[in-house]
């Protein structure tokens, strides 16, 4: 499903579909369901010029609900920061579902998979996030991406850097997948779509003895199983193909001028601190880059340790408002 259009002048390619649109000039984009964790109504500022929202972008293979506990903690910590004067302005908290995740509809597959169809899929998704924020009356946001959500946050920076008031990268990477990992994504997408099943991604809910204390808990396992069972197989397939065909964005790190946060769990099997610290070090154009290591934490830091992640995000918001 697609709706609306947006003109992003940073891109030079062209195409004719939402999932294969490079220029985004008069391009139909995806309609994303947006969860509002915190709203701000400022009667004295109808144009929202002094208010900058924070946008929480979820990881794969779940939806915005992975942010529930973190958003609750973020709400409380924003209240405290406002009362103490550490924040000058209130902060709306939004968490849109990606294409085919949660309450956002998945595009209909009209033909067999072709890599060309997904060459600009990430751009279309990222532009849809930007359009959602602009439709709400905001020119900029603090973009927070976890895992696959980090690809979107970095792509927003690539497409429209002036829309980035701040950026947080959690449990993610800027580089493309290694060939074997890329092939695995495409294989999972094929099985999910062909067999109408979520089973190929259910391993995200299951723990090993190397995982964090939280991830090994029955509550975490059951919650993640429920979230995954709620997903649309065609949505999982689309997002896996989008990620498999995404561009390398390591070149974006030194171009980030806004305040930034990089968050990594010590037990993350794919984006541990030794992988993410160089990403923070590469952000040489930003005056504020905070690197947070979360102990006993795996790949879903915001779900496993919501308070610690929310605390890092409040620090980022303070840096944004005082930048």
Which residues make up each language-model segment?
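Flexible "cap/lid" loop of the alpha/beta hydrolase fold
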Residues: 151-199
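Active-site glycine-rich loops that stabilize anionic/oxyanionic intermediates
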Residues: 51, 59-62, 147
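Conserved alpha/beta-hydrolase catalytic His-Asp/Glu region
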Residues: 177-183, 195-255
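Acidic beta-to-alpha connecting loop that harbors the catalytic carboxylate
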Residues: 266-269, 296-298
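Short alpha-helix in the alpha/beta-hydrolase fold that links the catalytic acid
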Residues: 258, 272-281
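Short beta-strand/loop motif that positions the catalytic acidic residue
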Residues: 256, 262-264, 268
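Active-site loop/oxyanion-hole signature of alpha/beta-hydrolase fold enzymes
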Residues: 16, 20-45, 65-144, 159-160, ...
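Catalytic histidine-centered segment of alpha/beta-hydrolase-like enzymes
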Residues: 291-311
């Amino acid at each position: 499903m697609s709706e609306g259009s947006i003109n992003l002048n940073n891109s030079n390619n062209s195409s004719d579909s939402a999932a294969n649109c490079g220029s985004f000039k008069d391009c139909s984009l995806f309609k994303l369901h947006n969860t509002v964790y915190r709203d701000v109504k400022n009667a004295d500022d109808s144009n929202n010029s002094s208010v900058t929202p924070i946008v929480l972008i979820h990881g794969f293979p779940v939806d915005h609900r992975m942010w529930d506990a973190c958003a609750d903690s973020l709400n409380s910590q924003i209240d405290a920061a406002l009362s103490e004067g550490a924040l000058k302005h209130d902060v709306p908290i939004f968490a849109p579902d990606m294409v085919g995740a949660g309450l956002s509809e998945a595009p209909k597959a009209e033909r067999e998979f072709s890599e060309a169809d997904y060459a600009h899929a990430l751009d279309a998704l990222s532009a849809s996030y930007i359009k959602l924020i602009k439709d709400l009356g905001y020119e900029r946001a603090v973009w927070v991406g976890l895992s696959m959500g980090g690809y979107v946050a970095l792509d927003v920076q690539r497409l429209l850097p002036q829309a980035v008031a701040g950026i947080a990268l959690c449990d993610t990477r800027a580089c493309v997948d290694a060939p074997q990992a890329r092939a695995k994504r495409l294989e999972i997408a094929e099985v999910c779509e062909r067999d109408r099943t979520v089973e190929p991604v259910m391993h995200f809910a299951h723990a090993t003895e190397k995982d964090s204390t939280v991830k090994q808990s029955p509550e975490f396992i059951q919650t993640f199983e429920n979230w995954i069972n709620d997903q649309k197989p065609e949505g999982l397939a689309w997002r896996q193909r989008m990620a498999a065909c995404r561009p390398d964005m390591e070149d974006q790190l030194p171009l980030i001028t806004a305040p930034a946060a990089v968050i990594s769990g010590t037990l993350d099997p794919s984006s541990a601190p030794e992988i993410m610290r160089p990403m923070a070090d590469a952000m040489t154009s930003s005056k504020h880059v905070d690197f947070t290591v979360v102990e006993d934490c795996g790949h879903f830091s915001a779900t496993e340790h919501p308070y610690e992640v929310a605390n890092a995000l409040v620090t980022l918001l303070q840096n944004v408002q005082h930048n």
